Amino acid sequence: MNHLIGDPGSLLDQFNPKYIQFISDNNIRQPSDIFVFLGEHPDTINDGYYMNRFHEYKWGNLPASYHNGATALSYADGHAATHHWTVTGEHGTIRPPVKGAVGGIIPAKPITDFQWVVDHSSILK
């Protein structure tokens, strides 16, 4: 679940202070652009939230790419869609799961896919 939707407590709010934390769905200005749920890559699943520190341009939580290089997302307006990732290679968004691999902190190089996630997680305050 997108950590900027709902009230995750003080721990997660502090990592992206320049972005709006949507406590109520009535406050989401562009609900068709903001995702609520997305498929997370199995190597970075560690809790119930999907969270990255936007200013670092590093994946802490990586999106899944099961669906031919895409993941499924549900949005705040109720629609669902898939998004195809573009970055492959060593630092790519598209990567196979590695059994036993846990944790992230993968540089987002180039930042194309990372920026897409930022742009669809919230908006600047």
Feature-to-residue mapping (PLM):
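Short, well-structured segments within or immediately adjacent to enzyme catalytic domains
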Residues: 1-125
